[in-house]
Amino acid sequence: MRHYEIVFMVHPDQSEQVPGMIERYSATITNAQGQIHRLEDWGRRQLAYPINKLHKAHYVLMNVEAPQEVIDELETNFRFNDAVIRSMIMRVKHAVTEASPMVKAKDERRSRDYSLEDANMDAEEAGDSEE
């Protein structure tokens, strides 16, 4: 079986359907003895340019190992699902399991925000103890 990287973008008004779509597509892959190496829900993000007069979309990234028939079925599902506004399936040489740069940047921002909150809390506590 070959390794693939799949990215699909969902209409922002259909964001509540994304978990169900992920579950359905994951089941399609695993039922055909495929494996999902990485699954990331990037959430709603700004588009680089408008697509169908939309400026935002809900992004999902999957790295999978699956037979070609499953990939063809996924591609057909993407094409006929009106909620999916764009999709891209690329073949890659090996399984990618590490976090994507999008998730790494989000984690760094989150840890930086927590460290700033901790510093503010420490400063407030120091101010309270001086009084």
UniProtKB/Swiss-Prot annotation:
State the GO CC annotations: cytosolic small ribosomal subunit
One matching Pfam family is Ribosomal_S6
Return one GO MF term: structural constituent of ribosome
SUPFAM superfamilies associated with the record? Ribosomal protein S6 (SSF54995)
Keyword match Coiled coil: no
Q: Where is the signal peptide?
A: none
Q: Residue spans with biased composition (Acidic residues)?
A: 119-131
Annotated region (Disordered), positions in chain: 100-131
Entry keywords, A to Z: Ribonucleoprotein, Ribosomal protein, RNA-binding, rRNA-binding
Q: What does this protein's UniProt record list under function?
A: Binds together with bS18 to 16S ribosomal RNA.
Similarity comment text for this entry: Belongs to the bacterial ribosomal protein bS6 family.
What this protein is called in its record is Small ribosomal subunit protein bS6
- List the source organism: Photorhabdus laumondii subsp. laumondii (strain DSM 15139 / CIP 105565 / TT01)
